[in-house]
Amino acid sequence: MSVLKRYDLEKLAVATVASHTALQILRGAKKYGFRTIAIAGRADVAEFYQQFNFIDEVWTVDFRNFVKAAEKLVEANAVFIPHGSYVEYVGWRQALEAPVPTLGCRELIKWEADQYKKMELLQRGGIPTSRVYKTPEEVDRPVIVKLFGAKGGRGYFLARDREELRRRLAGLSDYIIQEYVFGVPAYYHYFSSPVYGRVEVFGADIRYESNVDGRTFGWVEPTFVVVGNLPLVLRESLLPTIWKYGVQFAKAVEEVVGCRLAGPYCLESIIRDDMSISVFEFSGRIVAGTNIYMGYGSPYSVLYFDRPMDMGERIAHEIREAARRGRLEDLFT
């Protein structure tokens, strides 16, 4: 990326939107000696982030004109770390236009905004997925309906049969109908490292969702709004398969999307009682589930580095090593 060639590598700054995983990202960046910038969309949000001494600057900007803020980030010698709030609040169009060097495959942000393209990419990678129905007439079992975008489960709903599905789809647009797979949820955290030439299984979590995980006693319809995350240590016999799916996904991104995957990403799945895995979604950037081991380090990071490391630190470590080796352009698009 030509912008990086003009940067002073001794004065790199790391920036991200003040939400989602910003605390983890910026804490890790500061630990590795980078200047840090949090970008808030509201004054009250900015006030919260200003209290942390590992954040050097907090900007308040209008996300509707993020490209202008990105130009200032270039002037500040900053690289940008995308996450779910960036995808949702700024949007893929501005994400593609923003001139600031962005970690990972920038084009993947556009794919992430379309549920059908997400499933296509998983399938192209040879990863087992839940069945997708194009119309209610095809439905012959319970399904879950998901809205497009990184909405943290908001608006998702279950339908037990096609009649219920038709009724609840009235007035909706931009959604996908998926088979509801029975089992337990598991969300796998990966890191694709151009510096070390490998895909790392970094951790896993379970989402804590309102109100499906609450005390509803059957009185209300289940909803799936993510309010937090719970830690998960996977059965070791599952790890080879989970790692393989992560590798296959990284290869699919490079072959289908046309850019190399670099940095954190996530495959979201159900594990059945026969230990088979059905992947129903991906996130092509850091996920909020990595916050469960912020400051402590993930259970698998010690396997790669012989010391605990959280995902924010892992990102900063990769940036530092790439800068030392003259390979920042392998990380940023």
UniProtKB/Swiss-Prot annotation:
Every ATP-grasp domain range: 106-313
Source species, domain of life: Archaea
GO BP annotation list: 'de novo' IMP biosynthetic process
Cofactor(s) needed by this chain: Mg(2+); Mn(2+)
EC number: 6.3.4.23
Cofactor binding comment, as recorded: Binds 1 Mg(2+) or Mn(2+) ion per subunit.
Residues binding ATP, per UniProt: 136-187, 209
Pathway assigned to this chain's UniProt record: Purine metabolism; IMP biosynthesis via de novo pathway; 5-formamido-1-(5-phospho-D-ribosyl)imidazole-4-carboxamide from 5-amino-1-(5-phospho-D-ribosyl)imidazole-4-carboxamide (formate route): step 1/1
GO molecular function: ATP binding; ligase activity, forming carbon-nitrogen bonds; magnesium ion binding
Pfam family of the protein (one): DUF1246
Broad enzyme group: ligase
Record has Magnesium as a keyword: yes
SUPFAM superfamilies, A to Z: Glutathione synthetase ATP-binding domain-like (SSF56059), PreATP-grasp domain (SSF52440)
Residues the record lists as binding 5-amino-1-(5-phospho-beta-D-ribosyl)imidazole-4-carboxamide: H20, S85, N229
Keyword match NADP: no
Catalytic activity reported: 5-amino-1-(5-phospho-beta-D-ribosyl)imidazole-4-carboxamide + formate + ATP = 5-formamido-1-(5-phospho-D-ribosyl)imidazole-4-carboxamide + ADP + phosphate
Record keywords: ATP-binding, Ligase, Magnesium, Manganese, Metal-binding, Nucleotide-binding, Purine biosynthesis
Sites where the protein binds Mg(2+): E268, E281
Gene3D superfamilies for this protein: 3.40.50.20, ATP-grasp fold, A domain, ATP-grasp fold, B domain
Function description: Catalyzes the ATP- and formate-dependent formylation of 5-aminoimidazole-4-carboxamide-1-beta-d-ribofuranosyl 5'-monophosphate (AICAR) to 5-formaminoimidazole-4-carboxamide-1-beta-d-ribofuranosyl 5'-monophosphate (FAICAR) in the absence of folates.
Family: Belongs to the phosphohexose mutase family.
Protein name, entry field: 5-formaminoimidazole-4-carboxamide-1-(beta)-D-ribofuranosyl 5'-monophosphate synthetase
Species this protein is from: Pyrobaculum islandicum (strain DSM 4184 / JCM 9189 / GEO3)
